[in-house]
Amino acid sequence: MTMRILCLLMSLFISSSLLAEKSEKLPIKFALKFGMVKGKMSILDKFKLVKELGYDGIEVNAPSGSREEFKAASEATGLPIHGVVCSTHWKLLLSHPEAATRAKGVAGFEQAIRDAHFYGASSVLLVPGKVNKDTTYEEAWKRSIPEIRKALPLAKELNIQIGLENVWNDFLKTPEGTLKYINELDSPLVGSYFDIGNTVRYNDPSTWPSVLGNKIFKLDVKEYKRQPEGGNVWKGFKVKIGAGDNDWPAVCRELKKVNYSGWATAEVGGGDKKRLAEILTNMRKAFSH
């Protein structure tokens, strides 16, 4: 009788543990990019709208000509600017063949770090380089690493994380390659700004967390639908979050395994109040697994 009761209790414990594991949601804070908020409104009114809709934060470009307005709007509404996106990393590539261009890129990157600190943000999103007709994969690697290192003392001084985003730049397209690059920079302040939708065309997003682990600093959120052979691959981003080929339950499961918690920022086509509300609803559903 005692053994029966013991077995029953153990069975109930295991069942409840599995149920709790299944129902536990990722501790996510939801944000969007400032440029997604459309309409003829002041910066302050846009911050008010985002706050009203229930977003936890917002991300802005830096350097920016609206620096003071962004900070004032954040303070007035209580909506935190959790991070900034380096606004110079495409025009002034850190992998550019010309040293003068790379130097300008570093200057823009360092200003983004200063702006992040000014806002009370914790990170700068950075695209580290690009492979093109002028730059091979190996050259992009060898040129960009030293340039990023130049900004690391400032990042350390101001305690700003550098999140390297995986984008369609033909560079760092796998989690293994991304981790190797991060490890070569050898700084606790350098990690991955993991863009979930950007990987779907190349590989399964759910395979990234197990490789990168705690090097995933933040998440960019978009959806993607794989296109037929010969089709316009950019059309794949037209689908709403949750309506594409991304396996959100698998992504959530893998993020839980590495104990991810923190920011998930939408990077999709924005719009008016109704559209922004829809995006937040779709994100919450995607991360509910």
Kindly give the residue locations of the regions a language model identified.
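Acidic/histidine-rich catalytic cores of soluble enzymes
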Residues: 51, 76, 84, 149-245
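Bacterial N-terminal signal peptides
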Residues: 7-16
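Short acidic/histidine-rich active-site segments
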Residues: 263-269
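Active-site acidic/histidine proton-transfer and metal-coordination neighborhood
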Residues: 22-24, 95-191, 249
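Residues at the N-termini of beta-strands
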Residues: 57, 123, 218, 262-263
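Acidic-and-aromatic substrate-binding clefts and catalytic sites of carbohydrate-active enzymes
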Residues: 37-42, 57-70, 93-94, 132-135, ...
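N-terminal pre-domain/capping segments
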Residues: 2-5, 19-117, 156, 187, ...
